Amino acid sequence: MPFSRLFGKKEKNQMDDIDNIVEEGVQRVQELPMDKIFPNQFQPRTVFDQDKIDELARTIRIHGVIQPIVVREMEPDYYEIIAGERRFRAVLSLEMEKIPAIIQNLDDEEVAAIALIENLQREELTPIEEAKAYRSLLDMQEVTQEALAQRVGKSQSAIANKMRLLKLPETVQEAVLNKQISERHARSLLALETEEQQVALLAEIAENHWNVKQTEARIQEILGVKKPVATKKTKPKRQAISRDVRIAMNTIKQSVTMVKDNGMDLDFTEEETDDFYQITIQIPKKK
């Protein structure tokens, strides 16, 4: 079955594609031994919410497994999970010996794609899990970033930006994976030149509980970027100087007018240059 079944068409919904592939050639539901089933090697999720699994287990204890898991046979009587790992983990926690399953014949590319899309649609992945899943699919060389973006409902730039997180040191990736720092924190660390700087700043973020804005400010310090001097700070000074000059000029002119009104014949001239105002007052010695 070609990988294009999932990534070659635009008009169908992602989950419809998965359901159609799973339904095609569906065999009857079988009860498979739990010890003959192993997790999906392409499972993008590396951290499972144990509280949610426990909640699911309580539901299964009362109602049973309503929706069978989907598997593929890897060796005679050994099966890999395609979809339903949370159900498998919940049943495992209940120490049940068997689980209802549907066996499908899918290749690696289709299994990887289904695992990614199922998680994106049904439960949020961490940014690192999502990035690694994208890389896994692209490394199979069966799909372009653009085609992948169309099928998972993302923009090509969103996928590219997500994958940039994989350029960070493993220590930083683990911090994102474990939700010790946010994706925005991690993105800001990409501005630093070396892994040593990135790991060192990660420690500072944890120690000081910095938010993203504080982290970005610290990065500017590390990079030696000087903040531009705000022009607004100098405007009041220039305005004050201009205002003082006008007051001085008006005061002089008023004084000259007052003297003229008292009968004194004055010759008043003013000249403006780039650097100063020049005022000349000539007072005749004789009337």
From Swiss-Prot:
The reply to whether rRNA-binding figures as a keyword in the UniProt entry is no
According to the UniProt entry, its GO molecular function terms are: DNA binding
Which compartments does it reside in?
A: Cytoplasm, Nucleoid
Single GO biological process annotation from the record? chromosome segregation
DNA-binding region, as residue ranges, is located at 146-165
Q: Which InterPro entries match?
A: Chromosome_partition/occlusion, HTH_ParB/Spo0J, Nucleoid_occlusion_protein, ParB/RepB/Spo0J, ParB/Sulfiredoxin_dom, ParB/Sulfiredoxin_sf
Family to which this protein belongs? Belongs to the ParB family.
| Role summary | Effects nucleoid occlusion by binding relatively nonspecifically to DNA and preventing the assembly of the division machinery in the vicinity of the nucleoid, especially under conditions that disturb the cell cycle. It helps to coordinate cell division and chromosome segregation by preventing the formation of the Z ring through the nucleoid, which would cause chromosome breakage.
Q: What is this protein called?
A: Nucleoid occlusion protein
**What is the native source organism of this protein?**
Listeria monocytogenes serotype 4a (strain HCC23)
Name of the coding gene = noc
